[in-house]
């Protein structure tokens, strides 16, 4: 459920919401003031007093932390990839499109504090706001728990996207591209439904169906639900212009 940023300041209610967010991600956090700042957009702080913090400084820090973690992970995990391939992969992973897509995956937008103007303009779904917030969140994790914990979080969140990129041989985020296309053309969002799981627990394959409205569009399979959704989105996007919804 979306949180109305004009309804509260940093109250017990807000702490409960932040606790819910952390629980969903299985993350421990010591400094809730720091976490709250990471999820406070400048439009929100501007509506309060000048002493109120926003996430711009944490975004600045998190951008560098995120780049280092991704660079280190790519270098160590893909020793046979060239410098050019690694640079291209890193640029894609830390792009606004990728960061905003990952932010949507963890429902980050629901916990961002926004000013009334951004709230009314669907700021929770804006790529720039989501990408900035996830950078600020990474910066906050780094300050709160150190580089190792920040690395574990980032790698756990991003590794599937990196593996998909190299496996497909391209650097497109089909879920984000499909969502933009469908929202622009039909004013709704695509819906992914888990159809079935095949195989033993140690080698499970997930089968996902993709719908636009009530209409079935495509399906996809993968070693995780996210991978299956990405593959379903890829099929749908390539066929969408030929489908009469």
From Swiss-Prot:
- SMART domains for this protein: DSRM, RIBOc
Q: The RNase III domain covers which part of the protein?
A: 18-146
Q: Which residues form the active site?
A: 63, 135
Q: Which GO terms describe its biological process?
A: mRNA processing; regulation of gene expression; rRNA processing; tRNA processing
Q: What family does this belong to?
A: Belongs to the ribonuclease III family.
Q: Which UniProt keywords apply?
A: Cytoplasm, Endonuclease, Hydrolase, Magnesium, Metal-binding, mRNA processing, Nuclease, RNA-binding, rRNA processing, rRNA-binding, tRNA processing
Q: What does this protein do?
A: Digests double-stranded RNA. Involved in the processing of primary rRNA transcript to yield the immediate precursors to the large and small rRNAs (23S and 16S). Processes some mRNAs, and tRNAs when they are encoded in the rRNA operon. Processes pre-crRNA and tracrRNA of type II CRISPR loci if present in the organism.
Assembly and partners are described as: Homodimer.
The record's subcellular location field reads: Cytoplasm
Name of a matching Pfam family: Ribonucleas_3_3
The protein depicted here goes by the name Ribonuclease 3
Q: Which GO terms describe its cellular component?
A: cytoplasm
Q: Which organism is it from?
A: Borreliella afzelii (strain PKo)
Q: Which PROSITE patterns match?
A: DS_RBD (PS50137), RNASE_3_1 (PS00517), RNASE_3_2 (PS50142)
Query: So what does this thing catalyse?
Result: Endonucleolytic cleavage to 5'-phosphomonoester
Residue ranges constituting the DRBM domain according to the UniProt record: 173-242
List, alphabetically, the InterPro entries matched: dsRBD_dom (IPR014720), RNase_III (IPR011907), RNase_III_dom (IPR000999), RNase_III_sf (IPR036389)
Known EC number: 3.1.26.3
At the highest ranks, the source species' classification is:
Bacteria, Pseudomonadati, Spirochaetota, Spirochaetia, Spirochaetales
Binding positions (Mg(2+)): 59, 132, 135
């Amino acid at each position: 459920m979306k949180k109305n940023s004009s309804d509260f300041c940093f109250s017990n209610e807000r702490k409960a919401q932040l606790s819910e967010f952390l629980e969903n991600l299985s993350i421990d956090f010591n400094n809730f003031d720091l976490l709250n700042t990471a999820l406070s957009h400048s439009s929100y702080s501007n509506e309060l007093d000048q002493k109120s913090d926003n996430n711009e400084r944490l975004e600045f820090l998190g951008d560098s932390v995120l780049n280092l973690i991704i660079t280190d992970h790519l270098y160590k995990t893909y020793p046979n990839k060239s410098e050019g391939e690694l640079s291209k992969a890193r640029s894609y992973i830390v792009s606004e499109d990728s960061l905003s897509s990952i932010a949507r995956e963890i429902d980050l937008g629901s916990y961002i504090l926004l000013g009334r103007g951004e709230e009314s303009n669907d700021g929770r779904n804006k790529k720039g706001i989501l990408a900035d917030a996830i950078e600020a969140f990474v910066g906050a994790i780094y300050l709160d728990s150190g580089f190792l914990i920040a690395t574990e979080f980032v790698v756990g969140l991003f590794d599937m996207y990196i593996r998909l990129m190299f496996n497909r041989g391209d650097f497109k985020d089909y879920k984000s591209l499909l969502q933009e296309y469908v929202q622009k053309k039909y004013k709704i969002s695509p819906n992914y439904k888990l159809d079935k799981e095949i195989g033993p627990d140690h080698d499970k394959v997930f089968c996902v169906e993709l719908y636009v409205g009530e209409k079935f569009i495509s399906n996809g399979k993968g070693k995780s639900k996210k991978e299956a959704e990405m593959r379903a989105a890829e099929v749908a996007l390539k066929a969408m212009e030929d489908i009469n919804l």
